[in-house]
Structures are given as C-alpha cells and as structure tokens.
C-alpha cells in the first residue's frame, strides 16, 4: 500500500513538474513560434506570458506590433494591454507546426497609422492597412473565432515631423467560425467566416487644411445584412461661407450633415472594407442637411471641367454601387450664392425633403434600363413641390439625357422676391400662383420645355429707381404684363421653349434656369423680359 502511495505521489510530482516545464517552454518559445513565418509583415512581441495548461489558455501582456518594413508609404504600429488565446491545442503546439486556437481576444488595442505626407490621403488606404494587419496576425495559425474589444487609433502624416490628422475609439470586432485558409476581402477580417459584427465611434479625419470629416459611429452585422452610420459630417473649419470668401476662385463649397445612414439587404458581392463596393437592396438616408455655397465675386477656375448631369453624377461615385432603392427622409438641401457686388448670400431651401431613387448603378459596364427619381419638398417654406425624373442609362460618354416632370402647389407670388433677389430688377407686390407645372426633355446641351404658369392679380414694382421714374416705369410694366393668366382667360398663355444648358453648372442650375425662363415667357411682355432678363457673360456663361 505504501509503495502504491509513493508511486502515485511520484507520478503526481512528475505531472506537476511536467506541466511547469511545458508552461515554461511555451512561455519561452511562443514568441518565436508566432513570428516564425519569414513572409510576415509584422513582428508581434510581448513582455509577459501566462500559460494555464489545464484551461488550455495563454494570456499575453504588454504586446507590441511593429512593421518589419519601415520604408512603406503607410504603416501601422500597435500596442495592447492583453491578448488571450483560448482553447489552445497544446499538443499541436508541442508536436506540430500549426497553432490552433478556438478564440483569439484582443483587449484595448491602440493603433497608430502613419503615412508619408507626399502621398494623397485616401480612406481606402487606412482600411486596407488595417485589413492587412488583421490578416497578417490571424493567418499565423488556425484561429476559429476573433474578438477585439475597445480599440482606438490615431492617424499621422510624416514629413520632417509627425502631424496628427485623425483618430477613432470604441473599435470592436467579433468574428465567428473563421476559415483562415480561405481568403475573402469583404470584411475587416479578410477570411471566409460564418458571421462578423463590428462597430466604431468618434472617427475624425482632417482631409485638408480647411475640410474635415467626422463619423459619430458605425456598426455592421453580417447576420442582419445591415450597415449603420450615424452623425456623418463634412464641414469646413469655420464655415463654407468663410471658406468661399477666402477662396481665390469660384467653386462649390459643400457641407454635409447626416443623422443616420443605413444600408440593408447587403449582397455577398459587397465589400464594406478596403476597396469599397456596395451591392444592396436599400439605402436609407435620414435627416440629410446639404449646404452648397458659391461666391460669384470670385473668378471661375481657368481649367474648370464640364459638370455632369444625373447619370454622370452617379458615375462619379468613387466606388462600385448597385442599389435597388435609395430613400431620403426628413432632409434639407440648400443652394446659396453670393451675387456679384454683394457680401451676403441668397438661397434656395428645399425643406422637408423626401425622395426615392430606384435602380442606382455607378459602373457603366453594369448599367441598363433607367434610373427613376421621385422627390417632394417645400421651397423656402412656402411652396410645396414634387418632381419625377427618368434617367436612361445611355452607356455612351457625352450622351446624357433625362426627362423631368415637376409641379408646385399654390402660393403667394410676393414670396418669390426672396428667391429672385438680385437676379431681377423688380419686386412682386401682389398676386397668387394657382398652378406651376413644367416638363423637360434635356440633353447635355439644352432642354426642350413645356410650362404652365397660372396666376392672378400680379403687380410689380421696379427696384432702385428715382421715385417719379420708379412710379412711371412700374405703372408701364403693369400695363404691359398680364395681371392674370388663367385657363378661362381669353389670352391664356403656356410656354413651349428651349433652355440652353450652361455646361459649367450643374443639373439643378438647368432646372432653375428653365423655370425662370418659362415664367418670363408667360408673365411679362417684351419690355419686362429685358428688365428681368439676365445676360450671359462674354465667356459663354462661365461666370453665371
């Protein structure tokens, strides 16, 4: 009996010693094992290893990630409080060449992304770099699940010194059932997997000296096939008004604020990481506020390109996009300009905007059929309006066209004074608009239009004239125009006309010019068209 107890005691002691030796061996050799691949892009080092053999668990503390090549256009370095390897195949480490782990968990990693200052900043550069980092680490073994908790990062440019241009925090990833021998570049973890969820908060990027982009948060869940972005902002350091005043040239200064953007019914053909491509059933944009400002006191750029129309704008999207429906809710779009000789902008405000755009395809090789746009808004708070646009996909460069039908509900005509502003030489003192409808058949050079503009009791008053001359000319103007234009009137007028497109201005400028020309065609006589008309500058309309 005593001999048996001695034997059991010896075996137990031998087992304890063996476990201790194995744990010490693993602690000593693990760093060499995880850095054994000569083709690895990063070195993974750590100061402390805690091996728990019975739990099949290894915990690494004070981890550092550093690139093996430091002369690349962009690099990532990282530190972590701890990393846990759970469900480790101990026998595989001891007697095999493969490191098999059930779960790899990163706690509070901090990343530093650095790029050479001479290289242009592209958001895809950052996501590509992180995808490469995760792929490099996870490919060092057979890892079934990956968890990253509470990560953060900073972005720097490098010239003579480091300059910070961005940051993020609360970065989380959970990837389940990875197949590390099967590459798939759709997600942050670049392997085939059963499911992945990820989230991030407080992303900020300084795009240039004046313009910045921020994102309050995003989340992605592959099981729900949904991608959420909240509080997106594209803004100038002070405002787009101040930026337009400082600028040496005339151009569009655009600020964007979006409360919520959601992409749903995401196809497996999509890639939401690295080189973006989005194939989805529905994109919902809630509470978009877009403000576009132009300062006409500044000269246009000498080499200014021609502006595209609807099809061309879709093709300018910098990544492949194929979406069944884009839905816009609770939004506002403002087009503002500072007229020549003025210091304050006037604006067109499309409030309470809702829209639905179907069959949106950015790659011309995939385009077929037509894109349909339906929109409703209230113009400057007084004129409810609707618009339907059909955009055929021509797939031919320089052959854009669209057909538009729009209508505006009744409103008081004096409300137009705030919109017409400095574009005309008169004020509207009274009158009501009963119906305004326009159809347009537009190509890249001109639009053929038909318009109904029904109004009654229209009266005008000239601006900025001596009192006697002002009274006389205002009386003459009201004699020459038709005070009423209703279907029951004998001289009821509609307008069939053409509007030449200014190729250096956008599509909405063509729509506005067509509306303006149609109103002038119907309401005033020849004298008023001369008074109200705006002549093209000698440069073919570039300054308009």
Task: List each language-model region with its residue ranges.
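N-terminal type II signal-anchor transmembrane helix
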Residues: 1-39
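Extended terminal
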Residues: 2-8, 390-394, 407, 418-544
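A short, amphipathic edge element
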Residues: 40-47, 431-433
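Flexible beta-edge/linker motif
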Residues: 45-118, 131-160, 164-167, 174-232, ...
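Glycine-rich, small/hydroxylated-residue low-complexity segments
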Residues: 99-101, 198, 215, 256, ...
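Structural signature of outer-membrane beta-barrel domains
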Residues: 109-111, 237, 456-458
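Short, flexible helix-coil linker/hinge segments at the edges of structured domains or between repeats
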Residues: 118-127, 243-245, 293-311, 344-349
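Interface amphipathic segments
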Residues: 164-167, 180-225, 229-245, 299-302, ...
């Amino acid at each position: 009996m005593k001999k048996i107890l001695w034997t059991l005691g010896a075996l137990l002691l031998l087992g304890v010693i063996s476990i201790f030796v194995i744990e010490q061996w693993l602690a000593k050799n693990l760093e060499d094992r995880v850095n054994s691949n000569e083709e690895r892009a990063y070195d993974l080092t750590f100061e402390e290893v805690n091996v728990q053999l019975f739990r099949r668990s290894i915990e690494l503390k004070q981890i550092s990630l550093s690139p093996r090549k430091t002369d690349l256009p962009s690099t990532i370095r990282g530190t972590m409080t701890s990393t846990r390897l759970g469900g480790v195949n101990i026998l595989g480490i001891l007697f095999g060449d493969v490191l098999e782990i059930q779960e790899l968990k990163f706690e509070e990693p901090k990343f530093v992304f650095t790029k050479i200052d001479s290289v242009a900043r592209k958001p895809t550069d950052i996501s590509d770099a992180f995808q490469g980092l995760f792929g490099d680490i996870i490919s060092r073994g057979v890892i079934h699940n990956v968890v990253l908790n509470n990560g953060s990062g900073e972005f720097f440019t490098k010239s003579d010194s480091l300059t910070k241009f961005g940051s993020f925090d609360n970065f989380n990833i959970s990837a389940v059932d990875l197949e590390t021998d099967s590459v798939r570049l759709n997600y942050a973890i670049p392997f085939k997997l059963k499911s992945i969820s990820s989230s991030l908060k407080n992303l900020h990027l300084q795009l240039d000296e004046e313009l910045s982009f921020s994102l309050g948060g995003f989340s992605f869940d592959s099981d729900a096939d949904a991608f959420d972005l909240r509080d997106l902002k594209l803004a100038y350091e002070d405002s787009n008004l101040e930026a337009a005043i400082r600028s040496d040239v005339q151009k569009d200064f655009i600020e964007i604020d979006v409360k919520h953007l959601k992409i749903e019914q995401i196809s497996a053909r999509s890639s939401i990481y690295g080189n973006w491509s989005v194939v989805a059933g529905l994109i919902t944009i809630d509470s978009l506020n877009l403000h576009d400002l132009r300062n006409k006191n500044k000269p246009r750029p000498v080499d200014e390109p021609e502006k595209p129309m609807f099809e061309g704008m879709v093709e300018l999207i910098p990544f492949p996009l194929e979406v069944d429906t884009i839905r816009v809710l609770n939004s506002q779009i403002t087009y503002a300009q500072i007229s020549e000789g003025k210091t304050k902008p006037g604006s067109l405000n499309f409030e309470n905007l809702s829209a639905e755009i179907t069959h949106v395809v950015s790659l011309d090789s995939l385009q077929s059929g037509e894109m349909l746009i339906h929109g409703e808004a209230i113009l400057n708070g007084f004129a409810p309006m609707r618009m339907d646009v059909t955009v055929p996909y021509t797939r031919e460069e320089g052959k854009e066209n669209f057909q538009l039908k729009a209508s505006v509900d009744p409103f008081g005509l004096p409300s137009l004074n705030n919109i017409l502003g400095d574009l005309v030489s008169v004020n509207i003192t009274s009158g009501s608009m009963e119906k305004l409808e326009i159809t347009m058949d537009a190509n890249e050079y001109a639009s053929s239009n038909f318009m109904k503009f029904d109004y009654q009791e229209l009266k005008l008053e000239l601006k900025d004239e001596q009192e006697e001359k002002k009274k006389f000319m205002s009386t003459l103007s009201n004699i020459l125009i038709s005070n009423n234009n209703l279907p029951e009137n004998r001289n009821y007028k509609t307008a069939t006309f053409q509007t030449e497109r200014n190729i250096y201005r956008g599509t909405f400028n063509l729509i506005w010019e067509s509306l303006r020309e149609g109103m002038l065609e119907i309401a005033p006589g020849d004298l008023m068209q001369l008074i109200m008309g705006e002549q093209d500058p000698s440069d073919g309309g570039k300054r308009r």
